[in-house]
Amino acid sequence: MLGIIFEVSRSDAHVTFHWGLNWIRQVLPASLYEEFGHDRELWSLIQKILRSEVLLTDGTEQSRERPQDQKTQKDWYSGKKKQHTLKTQILATSDGLEIVDAIAGVPGPTADINLFREQQPRLHPEQECMGDKAYIGAERMTTPHKKLKKKELTEEQREENKVISGKRIFIEHLMCRLKVFRILSHQFRLNSRRYRTVMLAICGLFRFKLGRIDFTIYDC
């Protein structure tokens, strides 16, 4: 498509696309942690600031091409989606307007709670978070009440679930904004090894669009 629009060869379009993608990754940090995590003193300050709110977390899966060998097929097959998928998990502020941390390109069957436990050490030890039922059992995590077998939720539990849902809507909006990019709205057709780069580049563009990154500091 780039070749048709700009009248360049397929190989030139390929090189230009991947050059631009890598450039975006270099200048637009995908998350607060990627931007400031290397500075222990500054990140410690940011942790204390984030501690004043409840962070939101959510995961999303995107279909990918079917791997050729059977072992790889099994590793990437999501029973939930009934297809081979790539998973991304986002940790965001309570208003859904800043990405605190992002993990992208892991196999779809990877449990959301395991990804959160991987991210948790980067947060303040007392940081409170909120997620859906996939995160039940995680420390310092508020989740909806899960209906037990042959037992209905109480009225109080249903009301609490509504409150949690109302607060989690902001990270759902964030996910929708990321999926505005068409490359995330259907099967990922590039080499799956490029998915992490693509996803994190889009996270960087999202942060830049909302003014979270001072682009003027880069010498471009």
Locate the predicted segments by residue.
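Short, well-ordered secondary-structure "scaffold" segments embedded in the functional core
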Residues: 1-25, 30-220
